[in-house]
Amino acid sequence: MTSSPQIYILLPVHNRCKITSDFIKCLKKQTYRNYHLVLIDDGSTDRTSETVLDLLPDATIIRGKGNWWWGGSLQQGHNWLVQERVPAEDYVLVMNDDTEFQGNFLEAGLSIMKDHRRTLLTATGYNLTTGQPQDPGGYKFAWKDLVCYETHDVSEINCLSTRGMLATVGDFLSVGGFYPRLIPHYLSDLEFTMRAQERGLKLMLHSDFKIGIDFDKTGNRDLSNETYIQYLLKNFSRRAAMNPIAWTNFIILRCPKEIKVKTLFKFWTLVLNRLFFVRSLSLIGHRFIVQSISSIKIIVSFVIRQGVRLIPFGMQQRMKKVVPAAIKRRLRKYHDNVH
């Protein structure tokens, strides 16, 4: 490894010019200066690329049409590294634009990596809003439960987030490319890093290598207020974290052979239960509650109105002398509505 290796920063973006600009300003404060930004602009229409070039004129821009998503964008970055014949001893850093980091971020990453070969290092995260640690970037995926558990224990980790992932170019390319058609967005990072571990690379975290994350800029997760058709469509959207097609492909690609069929059966049982049974009951329950509340309002209103009608108008006039002012106003309101 050279004494001052170059870091190639792969940054997928789409129509977040202000957020991307803030990232570039953060990047320009780095104490380590030997880096090159590869901006993968997937069809932005808000002048993101032009703004980045104003701030960082020597950046490389790869332009897409809006259909690459995360996995496809990283595949474009992968292709660029191969085409440019970037030296294997240099480094590649995958980043999200909705992150912030200290001025020694790049320097800290290189310092950690110089003692670790055949390694993928991912930045641990903290919440930009609260300032508290959140999402360590390292996970233990349990096939039995189909759940990805967060963990700081390197011995337990079997996959990583690629948000803030650092590796030598040689190690990064040795894993192979991504699967943008099979896993276009969510799960692409888990699949890639699982494959890396299977090929002998170490998955690593370090407390000195950290980023602040804006967790409000994530994909479709709250589907509770949607109609049933909207709910179905959003579940199958590429932005949906629980997209069943992406999950199926993920299981086929990375699940151990001996439990693959069983896991697929279990997964689709859960999917069908969630999409067609639980959600249907939820919608029925929601409509029942709304209709019940509406019915109660109608009944109460009817009883009140009928109650006022049962009081003779003459008696209402005599009551005015003894009824408190507040009640008189309410009685007058009812009287006006009835008559």
Please name every model-derived segment.
Residues 100-136:
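Conserved donor NDP-sugar-binding/catalytic core segment of glycosyltransferases
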